[in-house]
């Protein structure tokens, strides 16, 4: 009977140790069973037996080992069994930041069509402020910068009117060859892109330069500016790829160049933050994605599909647990790519 119990306790200890992983609530079966050779007994509680025959009940929140001197607590007597707080279920994945910040970011939707322009609020809820039907765009800082064969300037002509909606600003922009700008909660229209104020014609409006955090969305491979986002340091531009039939998948060209053969396609949305004036052309890039799509996307890169199914399941649990435990509301991102 004692040897049978020891074998059972070994299995129970493994289950208890799994239950002690922080941040991830674990729940075992309501009953454990042991066969003593004659009867099947239901054990409502788990016990460990030491070499001297002493026994100790194993609480749900403890990890114990049976030793020659009795049962010893290994750790994990307390853990937070509350569900981790993931605002709106969104994980922020840092793709480019610090020394890896980018001069420009090229996005190409692989599944879906068009982007919504907007920003994420403090609850990680996307607030839309405009859109485009283009499926390939480039995001740049509003400064003097060259991207491929296209040159952009920091100066523009701004019309005098303020518009209450994106549609109204877009209509005005279409009539004068300009583009709408979301400016601290309202809309303006700007025209052109000039390297200096002297180069900009002032006949249609006032010559202005964007703020220190202003960014532009450009039609990929052209000098056509689609949208400007100029809200200072309080908000960062986010682009939400659109796909009416399901989750959009987007390729980030710069990540593909950096990682070679890796496809660098992502679920979710993308946030762009312009760095300080020390490097005014640089942009950080953060992927905003739901926890489950994040796990679905990251697991194949960490473990190939040739692994046993149970191993893949375990890897998915690890990826989910790690992301859930790394949520950092006060930081710029939670995990890195």
Locations of regions flagged by a protein language model:
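Conserved, single-site charged/polar hotspot
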Residues: 2-337
